[in-house]
Structure formats: C-alpha cells, structure tokens
Amino acid sequence: MSFTSRLKKELFIKAQNLVPQHQLSRVVGKVAASENPILKAAVIHAFKTKYGIDLSIAEQGNALKYKSFNDFFTRALKDGVRLVDENPDSIVSPADGAISQIGKITAGEVFQAKGQSFSVEKLIGDPQLAQPFQEGEFATVYLSPRDYHRVHMPFSGTLTETLYVPGELFSVNQVTAENVPGLFARNERMVCLFDTELGRMAVVLVGAMIVAGIETVATGKVKPSGRIELQHHELKLEKGAELGRFYLGSTAIILFEKDKIEWEKRFKAESVVVMGERMGHTL
C-alpha cells in the first residue's frame, strides 16, 4: 500500500471519531423523513442518479410517488422479483447485498476482517443469550446504498426476544472493518433472537453513520434510548418473511448454533447475494 493510500485510510478512521455521529445521523434522519415535495424529490433524484437505482423491479416505479426519501429507500419489490428457496433444508440470504465474512465462530469470536474479530457475547449484548452461538456459524451481509433494504428471515422460527443495544455509529465498509476493532459489536444494533427446529438463531441488524433508523416487525422503528432494552415476543415468522428494514442501511449478521448448518462452499467474502438465495443447508 502506498504512503498516500495509507494516510487517507488513517485520516478517514480518525475522522470517524471526531464527527458527532449520533447528531449527524439525527439530522440526516429528519431530511430523509421529510415529506416536503421539493426537498424529498431533490434528495430522491440525487440518490437515484448517484447510485443508479433500478426502479423497474420496485412495486412503485415512479420516484415522485414516494411520500419521503425513507419511503423510497425502503421500497418494496414487485412480486416474483426475489424468489425464496423453498427447499425445507435451505438457509437463505436475509437481504440483497454482499457477504462481508462467512464461516465458523471460533472460541466465541466472529471474524470481521484480516486481523480483526469481535466476541459473539459483545455482539449480542448479553452473555446468557449469546451462549448458544459459541462455536456456531455466522454470515455477515453488507447492504450497499443501492440495494433493497428490507431484511427477511433466513429460516423459519419464532421470535422470542429483541435486544436493542446502544452504541457508536461508525461507517460500515471495508476500510472500517479492517481498522476499527470490534466494529459490529460497537455500533448501535437490534438483536433478534429466535427458536427454530435447529435450536437458536439470531439476526442482528447493525446501524452505521447516517443510518436514519432500524425497524422490525415486532418493535416498529427503534427509538434510541441510550440503554440496553430487552423485549419478549412470541411471533412466528416463516422463511423469507420480512423481519425488518434499514433507513439508510448497513449490515445484517445471522448466527446459528454449532453443528446445525453448513454454508454453501461457493460463498466467500465479497460474494454478491440476493434475498431468498440459498446460502446454506441444515445438517
């Protein structure tokens, strides 16, 4: 790596610590939620142009019909655009995106990037709730700005707990993954825990800088409180059902117990996935 490239990375990481992350995210959130016709049209047009958003696959193909940028960003897709693998033994991708990392949880540690990892206990935010996933399997899926931003069930199960864990709001990308220790266990997140026929399963929705919010079907839109909040539920959700959505998106991490599933060998870091695609299978 050249000196210039290394310097740029170092400055980018340092800037993450200097920027008022939560205040900036709140400001962006207000703009994203605005229903002012001129403002929301301008923001949607700029975003659509910059990221090449394909509205031909969206349920609502007219950008002017969305009531706010948030409404546009969390847009539904047309029926049939994403097909959920119906094989009963399949584990499917919870979202459109790219695999950041995938594999086994080793000695309670989840691999983040070269030289970086984080403990599953810190990710979940509760030692007892994290215990079933020690030595289990994980997959981290990053949702880019241009992706479909709803998160779906990777396997059928009953939602038993949600755990809001407050935290920082570092940007999520390859640079921060490689340089911010414990990135995903430090950022604000919503942990969703399930009982399944395979045992326990977790889907963790991780926030990031300028993410305007996280929403789940059980809790509605999360209202940051600055403290850990545990809620109990009894909500059955089938594989492929919507679980939640990101407002300006980030990352979904799925966890399974040891010796319950196996990932398809073709998947590795940076593999592109779409919601409903087979990523693994039960053992």
From Swiss-Prot:
Chief place of localization: membrane
Protein's name in the database: Phosphatidylserine decarboxylase proenzyme
Role played: Catalyzes the formation of phosphatidylethanolamine (PtdEtn) from phosphatidylserine (PtdSer).
Residues bearing the modification Pyruvic acid (Ser): 250
Key words of the record: Cell membrane, Decarboxylase, Lipid biosynthesis, Lipid metabolism, Lyase, Membrane, Phospholipid biosynthesis, Phospholipid metabolism, Pyruvate, Zymogen
Family listed: Belongs to the phosphatidylserine decarboxylase family. PSD-B subfamily. Prokaryotic type I sub-subfamily.
UniProt modification remark: Is synthesized initially as an inactive proenzyme. Formation of the active enzyme involves a self-maturation process in which the active site pyruvoyl group is generated from an internal serine residue via an autocatalytic post-translational modification. Two non-identical subunits are generated from the proenzyme in this reaction, and the pyruvate is formed at the N-terminus of the alpha chain, which is derived from the carboxyl end of the proenzyme.
GO MF terms held by the record: phosphatidylserine decarboxylase activity
Pfam families membership: PS_Dcarbxylase
Organism listed in the record: Acinetobacter baumannii (strain AYE)
Organism ancestry: Bacteria, Pseudomonadati, Pseudomonadota, Gammaproteobacteria, Moraxellales
Compartments in which it is found: Cell membrane
Membrane topology field: Peripheral membrane protein
The keyword Ribosomal protein appears for this protein: no
Coiled coil: none
Keyword Lipid metabolism: yes
